[in-house]
């Protein structure tokens, strides 16, 4: 996936670029992370954690006093303080994710991408993570339920006009290079050779680039130059 870091930096895994089915989907994830930065979520999260330390310290003080007379009471007081602190942090995280989704949609639209890319990509994430969602208690999730987030996104884009956006050649070339870097060189050569032979590609230029890159990995330099 992708993540926001201190200083306004954003990290992107190559797996995300390969998993997206359009440039708008990739842009939607980046818009979400950019919104984390512009809305100062990390700084606000750290501030919330600092505020959460006071209840924890009070619970610890109560636990120490209670331990003199009743160890079970002491343990209960400490666990209550910990649970309250964790729940408060999770609430902040869920709110930040919702805000980043909403701000991200606006940013995506202003940048000229298809805003439906966000709902499409998160929809696939929901399918991949369904097993996790069915077994994890909702209140412990650090992100809102995927179904809730998708529903909110779809509600926000319904009133907006449809915009079909073609993928740029740069995006397709990057995807081709990453896919040509997967697995063994011979496997990559076979994969791209098959795509070109069967004409199973979005862009012939990107497919030929991936094939040449795979051939170079396999040390077939003369064939790659052709």
For each feature predicted by the language model, list its residue ranges:
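Extracytoplasmic and endomembrane cell-envelope/extracellular-matrix remodeling and assembly machinery
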Residues: 84-226
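Catalytic Zn2+-binding segment of zinc metalloproteases
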Residues: 24, 34-51, 69
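Membrane-active amphipathic alpha-helices enriched in small hydrophobic residues
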Residues: 53-69, 76-84
């Amino acid at each position: 996936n992708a993540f926001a870091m201190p200083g306004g930096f954003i990290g992107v895994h190559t797996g995300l670029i390969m998993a997206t089915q359009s440039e708008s989907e990739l842009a939607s994830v980046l818009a979400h992370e950019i919104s984390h930065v512009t809305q100062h979520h990390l700084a606000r999260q750290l501030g919330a954690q600092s505020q959460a330390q006071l209840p924890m310290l009070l619970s610890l003080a109560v636990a120490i006093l209670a331990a003199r007379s009743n160890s079970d009471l002491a343990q209960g007081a400490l666990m209550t303080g910990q649970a309250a602190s964790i729940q408060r942090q999770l609430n902040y995280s869920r709110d930040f994710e919702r805000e980043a989704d909403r701000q991200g949609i606006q940013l995506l639209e202003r940048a000229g991408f298809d805003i439906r890319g966000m709902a499409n990509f998160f929809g696939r994430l929901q399918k991949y993570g369904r097993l996790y969602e069915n077994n994890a208690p909702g209140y412990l999730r650090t992100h809102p339920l995927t179904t809730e987030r998708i529903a909110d996104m779809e509600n926000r884009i319904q009133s907006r006009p449809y915009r079909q956006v073609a993928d740029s050649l740069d995006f397709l070339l990057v995807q081709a290079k990453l896919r040509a870097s997967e697995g063994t060189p011979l496997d990559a050569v076979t994969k791209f050779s098959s795509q070109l032979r069967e004409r199973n590609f979005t862009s012939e230029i990107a497919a030929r680039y991936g094939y040449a890159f795979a051939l170079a990995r396999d040390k077939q330099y003369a064939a790659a130059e052709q």
